[in-house]
Amino acid sequence: MPGVANLALSPRKKKGQGLKPVGSFPKSVSPYKVQDMIGNVWEWVWEYYQPYPGNTFKTPAYEKKQIVVRGLSYMGVGHFSKKEFLKVVSLKARASYREHLNPLARKKDVGFRCAKDRPSFMERVFRVKADQPDK
């Protein structure tokens, strides 16, 4: 995805362009002005790897206290044939895609994602905390 994200683009070129500063891919800016949500580094989010609500799928990874990483990295997606490589990248190259990782693992292609909760409707409309008592 040249110009859009820092990702490996072929199985022969296993890596993207190495780490890049935030903002190096202006075509990837979201409507909320968030940058680099895919590519560059996997982003550690404040979440343990668990099934989504209502999902009955089971995996041993749910029992291991793995952390969630999102966004894919410049290091590639694993070992796939040329035919399958871009298909796999296109499936995983999205901000919502998640993988799991041991929280003690040290990887050069893992960073973290800063985020904050969306304000409640009342906070957005009245610009006050909804749980504050009237004065």
Which residue ranges define each predicted feature?
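Functional-site microenvironments in short loops/helix caps that host divalent-cation chemistry
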Residues: 1-94, 132
